[in-house]
């Protein structure tokens, strides 16, 4: 987990966000990087920021927006601009906290989402009960990759990661990193 703790990835800390993407890609070389912005992030800005990195290894997969069904209309009205942007930009929309809602309430929300975004796949059933094919479908089958024997060999051999010329921007960033290190966020440190 790589956390931007101050500012917004879609506006005020855009440069930090973009440099973090490159740093993560160049140091960890992940197959996938999941960006989980706060609920008030402007999704279209984040997508534009990722696309503006201009690095062929980094591309945006179909965005997934998760919406609390119980507060759907409240937040749609209270944070209209951000809410509408997240719904319009999503390829998949998953309702959460649906277990105590009636089918009629869920269908009302579904119809309202359809008025905003006719193309998104809208999932109104409880995601806790879904199988692996559901989760794979969120990313058009791209989430689970077959492991090659080369990749398995690399995983077995990899025991450490080192950085050259690493530095913290300020003491607060260093303290944050050291706290995460002590808490085991970066694996077993011997």
Predicted regions and their residues:
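Nucleotide-state-sensitive switch-loop elements of NTP-binding domains
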Residues: 1-74
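Conserved nucleotide-binding/hydrolysis micro-motifs of P-loop NTPases
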Residues: 39-41, 69-73, 98-102, 128-131
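Short amphipathic alpha-helical segments
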Residues: 45-48, 77-78, 106-108
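A short alpha->loop->secondary-structure connector
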Residues: 51-60, 83-85, 110-117
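Short, well-ordered beta-strand core segments
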Residues: 63, 93-94
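Flexible active-site lid/hinge loop adjacent to a nucleotide/diphosphate
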Residues: 73, 77-89, 93
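C-terminal accessory "lid"/substrate-recognition subdomains
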Residues: 88-92, 100-190
